[in-house]
Amino acid sequence: MSFLSNIFARRQQSSSVAKDRLQILLAHERGAGEAGESDLIRQLHKEIMEVIARHVAVDQDKVQIKVDRGSGCSMLEIDVEVPQELSGKRGS
Amino acid sequence: MAKVLVVTSGKGGVGKTTSTAALGAALAQSGQNVVVVDFDVGLRNLDLVMGAERRVVFDLINVVQGDARLSQALIRDKRCETLSILPASQTRDKDALTSEGVARVMDELREKFDWVICDSPAGIERGAQLAMYHADMAVIVTNPEVSSVRDSDRIIGLLDSKTQKAERGEKVDKHLLLTRYDPARAARKEMLSVEDVLEILSIPLLGIVPESEDVLKSSNVGAPVTLAAPTSLPARAYFEAARRLSGEKLEVSVPVEKRGFFDWLFKRDA
């Protein structure tokens, strides 16, 4: 497999992977400066928790916030685990 | 008018000390008075790379604290009389370097020499910031490797904000020195190319120093590569870089051994 894949697979050159990764990373590091990055996530986490807490009681640990950066767009992923009994009461 | 040059990188092990010694010796061989200053307090190595480790009596901290005069701490190179070294302290704490003391020593060095070349410690802490603070020019030593490029980008940011020039609203003259470059691997796209690194960091290119056995051989015997193996490829790259620092306009190329197919293949015209 590895022999054949070495011949036939059109893998991306590692140097262009390196260049792309660096360009994406540095574009954010230059803008964010020192600790801007983790500050943004912390702030988002805090405010999202406040909004949710107004309506339902959710455990701090059940809220996951992730950021995934691409060259074209970045994705902010917010994952809130809602307690079982509440999902039944919706719309009441 | 003396020029203060800092050789810096952020990341360790990319060739700051090697490049300081090689550029210093290259500039000194052109007849200019050069001092190389080791700012890596506690981990000094410039003395060893320059072959002066057994001649160190006083060091930068002794001079900063007024325990020794500058002339007592300077070591004149035995092979090149226009080249001197000011070693760092190996035993003292780096907090012993005060901003005022360093400023005083730098002023005194500016009067004595044409070039004051400061070998920065790795990192972005106080030692690195003191080494760059008085710089008019900076050589950013970078390997074609992701972590080195990232750290160089960070250092460029510091040069634009934490130096005396930046505080006065001026710019430190920044130059990229790409070291440990392997043109064959770059051609196979296994290594970031010169163009890739230049595009990412966007500062002018001072030189490309190819990966070479001569660099280790020279440090083994305690001589800058531009003194120990002046015709070697890395030495030629450093000599050309030194001429560019002196203001000459020279085309940058990847130095190659012979003129032939490979020469044609790897020749650059940027």
UniProtKB/Swiss-Prot annotation, chain A:
Keyword match Cell division: yes
Q: Which InterPro entries match?
A: MinE (IPR005527), MinE_sf (IPR036707)
Q: Which family does it belong to?
A: Belongs to the MinE family.
Write down the superkingdom of origin: Bacteria
Q: What Pfam families does this protein map onto?
A: MinE (PF03776)
Q: For this chain's UniProt record, which GO biological process terms are given?
A: cell division; regulation of division septum assembly
Q: Which gene codes for it?
A: minE
Protein name listed in UniProt: Cell division topological specificity factor
Q: Which UniProt keywords apply?
A: Cell cycle, Cell division
State the function annotated in the UniProt record. Prevents the cell division inhibition by proteins MinC and MinD at internal division sites while permitting inhibition at polar sites. This ensures cell division at the proper site by restricting the formation of a division septum at the midpoint of the long axis of the cell.
Q: Does the keyword Transmembrane helix apply?
A: no
